[in-house]
């Protein structure tokens, strides 16, 4: 039995859950192991940290092979998509980035650059971060007051304007607080984890637009003829494991089932594929290391 979970399962935060899983396995005669990995190590330019867990029906666990596949940079990877592939006209956010988020139009005007030129220069980050870092928020607000005083993400009267958003950002940062950043997000060599708002504000590195659904499917390693029936199902893309990441883990399970896995003397093993290190282990016949409980102050 095996599955995939959040990166937190591999950290101190997940120790309680891991201890319970180990106990369940021991009760039914299974050893237990974990491996942490990143989809960038499985041939796809998406930085997606995940944890895989395994219950082995043997007294000890196998040593899983370290995984690494060469990946292309984001631009070259997206360019693999043929012109006739479906879902290239399906977007979470349609239209140009400069039309959807007017402060970005200000940035291009200020820089004197095209979208692709700015993306190559900026490389990674959000427009809100760019404005803050370069101390351009006051000037951008003045520009918006002149050109688009009423514009926001939506044309509804109740929607906050971009001026409101930037003033809110100013206030939050002046208080040393964070803020919700829904501005266009740029990526260079790799995309961030394809989840949540990145599906809405992830910008194409060449074209003045957001990613289309086919590009999202490709970033999950799905076949180029794989489709979805309804735009409302697009978020299902993010609720899965990238294909090559899952494939590499499945190969290890297959080796075990065929009797080809390299077995260890450990009843519990914690491997980190991102740095090829053994983080924790318990040898057969030994007691696990004692853990000291800390009372919560909350």
Question: What feature does the model see in each segment?
Answer:
Residues 2-174:
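Class I S-adenosyl-L-methionine
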């Amino acid at each position: 039995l095996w599955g995939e979970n959040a990166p937190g399962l591999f950290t101190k935060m997940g120790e309680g859950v891991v201890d319970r899983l180990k106990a369940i396995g021991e009760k039914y005669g299974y050893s237990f192991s974990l491996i942490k990995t990143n989809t960038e190590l499985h041939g796809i330019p998406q930085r997606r940290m995940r944890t895989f867990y395994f219950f082995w029906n043997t007294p000890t666990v196998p040593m899983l092979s370290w995984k690494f596949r060469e990946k292309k940079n984001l631009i070259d990877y997206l360019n693999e998509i043929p012109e006739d592939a479906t879902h290239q006209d399906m977007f979470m956010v349609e239209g140009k980035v400069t039309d959807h988020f007017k402060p970005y139009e200000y940035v291009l005007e200020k820089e004197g650059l095209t979208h692709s030129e700015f993306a190559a220069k900026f490389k990674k980050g959000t427009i809100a971060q760019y404005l803050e870092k370069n101390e351009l928020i006051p000037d951008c607000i003045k520009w918006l007051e002149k050109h688009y005083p009423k514009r926001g993400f939506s044309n509804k009267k109740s929607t906050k304007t971009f001026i409101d958003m930037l003033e809110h950002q100013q206030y939050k940062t002046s208080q040393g607080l964070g803020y919700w950043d829904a501005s266009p997000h740029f990526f260079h060599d790799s995309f961030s984890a394809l989840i949540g708002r990145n599906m809405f504000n992830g910008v194409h590195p060449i074209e003045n637009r957001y990613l289309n659904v086919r590009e999202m499917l490709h970033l999950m390693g799905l076949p180029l003829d794989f489709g979805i029936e309804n735009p409302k199902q697009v978020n299902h893309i993010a609720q899965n494991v990238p294909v090559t990441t899952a494939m590499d883990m499945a190969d290890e399970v297959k080796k075990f089932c065929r009797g080809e896995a390299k077995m260890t003397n450990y009843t519990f093993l914690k491997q980190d594929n991102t740095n090829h290190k053994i983080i924790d282990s318990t040898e057969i016949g030994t007691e696990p290391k004692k853990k000291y409980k800390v009372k919560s102050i909350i």
